[in-house]
Amino acid sequence: MEAVTKLDVEGTAFDSVIIPPGSSKTHFLGGAGVRGLEIGGKFIAFTAIGIYLETDSIPFLADKWKGKTGEELAGSLDFFRDICTGPFEKFTNVTMILPLTGEQYSEKVTENCVAYWKAIGIYTDAEASAVDKFKQAFKPESFPPGSSILFTHTPSGTLKIAFSKDGSVSKDEGVLIENKALTQAVLESIIGEHGVSPAAKLSIASRLSEIMNKVGNVEEKLPVLS
């Protein structure tokens, strides 16, 4: 199927299908895009991000969103919210274009999460503990160009964090953090209302629109890893 293809973002290749660390389920590439900032009139790319969805996501999302254009999906906060909170696994591959320390990355992500939780009144001791575990997981890490942060987001609320120095996806599930709010918020920080990668959001909207409109049985149509 044409929509389920691999993508290249600033020289980083994202495979069309993978099995995430610590998972037995096949995920397809929902979309990918760059994260960057306009600095001095020039766009500087920091990371390339690929978002993968478990194949079971398509029937769930199609029930509400089939028939919508990519443009309509791209402009819908509810669509991306349904991806972040839906009852299926998600996998996020954040690959470095420029070098970054683990502390730099974790501070920025958790700062945004905590601000959001406090604003909606759900910041409790459980979230504070999860944030601390998240920071500790990243503290000793350093990410040169080409290295990756690998997040598996389970519907039960477990966030699995693994690291790769060469961009490969290992089978080691890495660090586990049991907190549903954090599991969802890490993905929302990328594709949510104030997500850091508008390019990834556009990519997901375009590709999922095509997949939902053309695929009847996703298990039959999507390629499956042996």
Curated annotation (Swiss-Prot):
Substrate binds at residues 47, 112, 189. One of its GO terms (biological process) is flavonoid biosynthetic process. The keyword Isomerase applies. Keywords: Flavonoid biosynthesis, Isomerase. The record marks 105 as: Important for catalytic activity. Its EC number is 5.5.1.6. Pathway: Secondary metabolite biosynthesis; flavonoid biosynthesis. It holds the Pfam family Chalcone. SUPFAM superfamilies: Chalcone isomerase (SSF54626). GO terms for molecular function: chalcone isomerase activity. It catalyses: a chalcone = a flavanone. It is an enzyme of class 5 (isomerase). The keyword Isomerase applies. Part of the biosynthetic pathway for all classes of flavonoids, a large class of secondary plant metabolites, many of which are brightly colored. Belongs to the chalcone isomerase family. Catalyzes the intramolecular cyclization of bicyclic chalcones into tricyclic (S)-flavanones. Responsible for the isomerization of 4,2',4',6'-tetrahydroxychalcone (also termed chalcone) into naringenin. PANTHER family: CHALCONE--FLAVANONE ISOMERASE 1-RELATED (PTHR28039:SF8), CHALCONE--FLAVONONE ISOMERASE 1-RELATED (PTHR28039). This is Chalcone--flavanone isomerase. It comes from Allium cepa (Onion). The lineage of its organism: Eukaryota, Viridiplantae, Streptophyta, Embryophyta, Tracheophyta. The gene is CHI.
